[in-house]
Design a protein with these regions (language model features):
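Long, highly charged, low-complexity internal segments
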Residues: 25, 34-55, 167-286, 290, ...
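Conserved ATP-binding/catalytic motifs of P-loop helicase motor domains
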Residues: 106, 175, 294
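Conserved phosphate/pyrophosphate-binding and hydrolysis machinery centered on Walker-type P-loop NTPases
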Residues: 6, 56, 60, 79-84, ...
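C-terminal or mid-to-C-terminal helical accessory/interaction module adjacent to the motor/catalytic core
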Residues: 71-72, 116-200, 247-254
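Extended, highly charged linker/hinge segments and catalytic-adjacent loops that couple domains
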Residues: 132-135, 148, 291-335
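Intrinsically disordered, low-complexity regulatory segments
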Residues: 1-140, 225-226, 333
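Solvent-exposed alpha-helical segments within well-ordered globular domains of core cellular machineries
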Residues: 14, 18, 61-71, 91-95, ...
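Short glycine-centered, acidic/aromatic-flanked micro-motifs in structured strand/loop junctions
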Residues: 80-82, 268-270, 298
């Protein structure tokens, strides 16, 4: 008799089943198993925002497989992703199984892990919890708002602007921000200005470049050389002078390493260094996560597990020596 574990993807299911052994059956939900009915009235504001859930054929099929596996099990572990959507999927799976009567006499618990490693998975199974109701309610509020905004505004948009796309809780606001920014760009008027730089050599023969900042006893402002004629006049005046280094200042600059990636910084860095779009970045990160190479990537937190920090410090010390490691781990706070 094996316990049943439900995750989101089949690739993750295979890995976790390997870690847990033959006493566990690990099945995938393949993402969300149901959603709101695609019709007017799926969310009822006058009835305490009651929500009508439609049936998804694939979701029904997967829940049926889970129900069959539960016939010989005592426990059901809901191990979907450790975020709001993951909590929602677990809630939907539990609710649909309860409707089928598949949970009678079964102990249902929620487990989460931020990395797919044997240690993390086994620790999660040993420390289960109940479903996080506030997180589920946050999902329900988000889903209801998405529906109400989309189904209310989209028909108006289509009537006023035939051929336009749908409206949305997030996309409509984002579109306004883009339009406002575009209006600012169109209102911008380019203005010409010139700067002058000179090439010098130190007594030791080292070359360096310096910018002209003062002319005829006055500091040059950004638009004081508005055209080529003014720049050439300033250049001629500058060439007639003699120059010496008045002082040299040396400063030690300390630069702290960046905190661990969260979703937004991961996407920005992948775009800057690798030229990857947001979707490609998240697909790649998802594959790395499911293979156990990185921690969960959909997060706005920057804290790391103590065990992970200790392992990293041991690796740095053995590979590069103690001089490359601070005396104590750096602490980063999530905003």
């Amino acid at each position: 008799m094996s316990d049943v574990v439900v995750v989101e993807s089949p690739a993750k299911a295979k890995t976790i089943e390997k870690y847990l052994g033959r006493d566990f059956t690990v099945l995938a939900s393949y993402g969300h198993v149901r959603d709101l009915e695609e019709k007017d009235g799926a969310v009822l504001p006058d009835q305490d925002f009651a929500m009508l859930w439609g049936k998804d054929p694939r979701g029904e099929q997967q829940v049926g497989k889970i129900a069959s596996a539960l016939k010989g099990a005592k426990r059901l572990y809901l191990a979907t992703d450790p975020d709001r959507e993951g909590e929602a999927i677990s809630w939907h799976v539990k609710d649909m199984l309860a409707e089928r009567g598949a949970l009678k006499g079964k102990h249902v618990q929620r487990i989460t892990f931020n990395e797919i490693t044997k240690r993390a998975v086994q620790y999660a199974v040993a420390h289960p919890r109940d479903l996080d109701q506030p997180l589920i309610e946050a999902y329900l509020a988000r889903r209801a708002l998405d529906y109400l905004v989309g189904y209310t505004l989209s028909p108006v948009l289509w009537r006023k602007l035939p051929g336009s796309r749908s409206a949305g809780r997030v996309q409509s606001v984002a579109l306004r921000l883009i339009c406002e920014r575009e209006a600012e760009i169109e209102a911008f008027r380019a203005r010409e200005y010139w700067t002058i730089e000179g090439r010098f050599t130190t007594a030791a023969g080292a070359p360096f470049t310096a910018r002209l900042t003062h002319l005829e006893g006055r500091k040059l402002e950004q638009f004081d050389l508005p055209d080529e004629a003014a720049a050439m006049r300033a250049k001629k005046l500058a060439e007639g002078g003699s120059y010496s280094v008045a002082s040299v200042e040396k400063r030690r600059v300390r630069r702290n390493p960046p905190p661990p990636f969260m979703t937004s910084t991961l996407q920005m860095e992948a775009s800057r260094k690798l030229g990857m779009g947001a979707q490609q970045t998240m697909r790649t990160a998802q594959a790395l996560y499911e293979a156990g190479h990185i921690t969960y990537m959909r997060t706005d937190g920057v804290t790391m597990a103590r065990e992970a920090i200790a392992a990293i410090r041991d690796h740095v010390k053995s590979e590069f020596g103690p001089n490359y490691m601070p005396a104590a781990p750096r602490e980063y706070a999530s905003k």
